[in-house]
Structure formats: C-alpha cells, structure tokens
Amino acid sequence: MKFFYLIFSAIFFLADPALVKCSEDCENIFHDNAYLLKLDCEAGRVDPVEYDDISDEEIYEITVDVGVSSEDQEKVAKIIRECIAQVSTQDCTKFSEIYDCYMKKKICNYYPENM
C-alpha cells in the first residue's frame, strides 16, 4: 500500500499541461492511485496516518522500482518527504493534498516517460 501512496502522490493537477513538462501517463497514474487510496481510506481499509513515517529506504526502493534515474532519486525523495511533512490533514483528504503537492513540485518530471 505504501507503494501506491507514494506513486499516487499527485492527483488533481489543474495547471495547463503545456506549461508543465509532466508526462500525462505519470499524472494519470498518480491521480488514479490517489483516488483509489482515498476510496480505500473512506472504506476503512487504509489508515492515512500509517504513511507519515515512511523511511528513506522505502522511498529509495520505490523510486528504483519505477525507474527514476539514479541522479534524480534524491530530488524525488526530497519532494516526497517535503510533501508528506507539509500535509497536516490526518483524514482521507490527505491523499489529495499530497497529490497536489507532488504536482506543484512537478514530480513527474523525474519519472520515465513509459511508467
């Protein structure tokens, strides 16, 4: 579940796609995973507080698994840590807020085109 939490992490991107170099596939994956986590949370299957203490090792494993280049892994890890830390909500809206943060920080710029 933590994999989806991090990968989803960018849900309601409203900016003009021409202004941001994020891959549409990446945005869609983040959006869909955030939406599914929100539904699972509302159904009681996911606890949003569970993800507050994700370790650097878990972040590294996830970035490697999805194909983030070695030179971008620390940048992506920093975005993930910052977004999780800045969200104060402890309810199911947390997933949407983290997604918004990821999109603002253009996390998809660091993911491969063929996610």
Curated annotation (Swiss-Prot):
Keyword entries, A-Z: Complement system impairing toxin, Disulfide bond, Secreted, Signal, Toxin
Quote the cellular component terms of the Gene Ontology held in the record: extracellular region
Q: Which GO terms describe its molecular function?
A: odorant binding; toxin activity
Cystine connections: C26-C108, C41-C92, C83-C101
Q: Where in the cell is it found?
A: Secreted
What tissue specificity is annotated for this entry?
Answer: Salivary gland (at protein level).
Q: Does the keyword Secreted apply?
A: yes
Signal peptide range equals: 1-22
- Taxonomy, superkingdom: Eukaryota
What does the record note on quaternary structure? May form multimers.
Q: Describe the function of this protein.
A: Salivary protein that inhibits the classical pathway of complement system activation in the host while having no inhibitory effect on the alternative or lectin pathways. Prevent cleavage of host C4 and consequently impairs the activation of factors downstream of C4b in the complement cascade.
What's the further remark here?
Answer: Recombinant protein produced in Pichia pastoris is monomeric in solution and does not inhibit the classical pathway of complement in vitro; however, antibodies against this protein inhibit the anti-complement activity of sand fly salivary gland homogenates.
Q: What is this protein called?
A: Salivary anti-complement protein
In which organism is this protein found?
A: Lutzomyia longipalpis (Sand fly)
The taxonomic lineage of its organism, from the top, reads: Eukaryota, Metazoa, Ecdysozoa, Arthropoda, Hexapoda
